[in-house]
A protein has these predicted regions:
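Short, Lys/Arg-rich flexible segments
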Residues: 1-210
């Protein structure tokens, strides 16, 4: 999602007064409104829809970037900033109440696993789901399928086709990117208001030097 200077309806008037300063102040306003307002509003809106675990947005993934954050910042040459979320589906184990017990070695295989993807909507796997350790110290939630069985209502379930786990499907919930795109339009007006306010505030602070 992009935050850019075209949202500043009065920008041309300020460019006519002080083009160099207007560019610099627009850059500052875009970056600050994206980081201080856009990110926080989006995280709050996403958390209301999907039960992402605490701290998940700031976790650093294999790409070296956080699961949700600034993709790039505005520069004087390019007056736009980008916000992006992790595009890979989120392991369903992240939404499981018993995940912490598994990490601590206290969860016995075959006992029920409770998953809450959407706040207030709980799904319990009685016996057929289990945690398993994956590469890079990740933890997955899997379910062993019967011959000919097909999964429905999943977000990119991955079927293991060889080895001792052949026939096990790794289960996933929505990606951060997917959820972010559903809330981006709703938060846009407030982000634009913050952008306009910050630009005018910065211009007022600098007006004596122009």
């Amino acid at each position: 999602v992009v935050i850019e200077a075209v949202g500043l309806s009065d920008l041309k008037r300020f460019y006519d007064l002080a083009p160099k300063a207007a560019t610099e102040l627009a850059r500052i306003a875009i970056n600050q409104s994206a980081e201080r307002v856009g990110l926080k509003l989006a995280q709050r809106a996403m958390a209301a829809q999907v039960n992402f675990p605490r701290g998940y947005f700031s976790e650093i993934g294999r790409s070296g970037k956080p699961n949700f954050g600034m993709a790039y910042r505005a520069t004087n040459a390019n007056l736009e900033a980008g916000i992006a979320g992790r595009q890979q589906p989120t392991s369903l184990s992240r939404f499981a109440t018993e995940r912490g017990r598994f990490v601590g070695g206290r969860h016995r295989r075959g006992t029920p696993i409770t998953v809450t993807v959407q706040p207030g909507r709980v799904t319990t796997f009685k016996r057929n789901a289990f945690f398993l350790r994956l590469r890079n110290n990740n933890i997955g939630l899997g379910i062993r399928l019967k011959n000919g069985e097909i999964l429905t209502n999943t977000h990119g379930a991955k079927l293991i086709t060889s080895g001792p786990l052949k026939g096990v499907a790794l289960l996933y919930g929505p990606s951060v990117d997917q959820v972010f795109r559903t809330v981006a339009v709703d938060i846009s007006p407030e982000v634009l208001d913050a952008l306009t306010f910050e630009f005018l505030r910065q211009f007022e602070l600098r007006s004596a030097d122009l």
